[in-house]
Amino acid sequence: VKLQYCNLGRLSYRDAWQLQESLRGQRIEGRIPDTFLLLEHPPVITLGRRAKEADILLDMEGLRSRGVEVVRIDRGGEVTYHGPGQLVGYLIFHLSVTSGSIKRFVHLLEETLIRALSHWGIEAGRHPVHRGVWVGSEKIAALGLSVSHQVTTHGFALNVSTDLSAFRWIVPCGIKDGGVTSMERILRRGVTLEEVRPVVLQELAETFGFTKVSPVDLYPAENPRGGGSIGAQRMSALDLSHAENPAYERVPVEHTFMSGLNSKANQSFPEG
């Protein structure tokens, strides 16, 4: 079973969302294998379909002054924060990896992060009510998935060295009685994404049962607007398929960030 992965560096939420849509179309058509994207976002607050504006506790002027983007998207779930120091993993996987079971998929994703955190002696686990990965009563990683035609997008956000004060701007995932934490806070020392990425990748591959894991490069078909880091590049024209099909082809896919799990074609797993 083959897995491709790519470290995208820092990438805007909108560009990452568009990239996932494109890759999902390619995965649905069988043009690429399961693909794992590792990245971090500039400061952004995302609002799912069940999000309440009251769960954003800072006014728009205050957010803008802090360089925080606000994006309303069509996934399930409520309000979530992403920012520097947070390892984000997006999984463009076919559900055949878990015999079609979304619950099994979520369980394995949580298990991946629990095992990864154990490398640093962090005892993480599951919450009896809320989704995600927790250390005691504090959440260290949020999960959120969308499924279309048996192919997933979205994934997890793990707080590595995240500025936790940013979570005071929102009610994270609508949970008012739970705190948030990070690896850096627990360990009381600096932790980098560079340290954490390979461990998460290894645990993901082992937990999901991939036997062949290989890196893949993303080549923008358009000229970057400013050059430099990949985060400054336009990601609207990308293809991960192999050499026999090098040209990018936009595969039309409908928006699938629908609330609830009542459609075989389009399902979502709220972020939490």
Indicate residue ranges for each PLM-predicted region.
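N-terminal lobe of the biotin/lipoate ligase/transferase fold
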Residues: 1-135, 139-140, 191, 222-225, ...
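Short, conserved beta-strand/beta-arch hydrophobic-aromatic motifs that form part
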Residues: 56-59, 143-160
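Short, structured patches in soluble enzyme cores that scaffold and shape functional sites
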Residues: 91-93, 147, 158-162, 184-187, ...
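Generic secondary-structure signature for well-ordered alpha-helical cores
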Residues: 118, 205-209
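Flexible, glycine/charged-enriched surface loops at secondary-structure junctions
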Residues: 123-125, 209-218
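Coil-to-beta-strand transition motifs
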Residues: 138-140, 149-151, 162-165, 178
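A hydrophobic, small-residue-rich beta->alpha segment in the mid-to-C-terminal subdomain
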Residues: 165-206
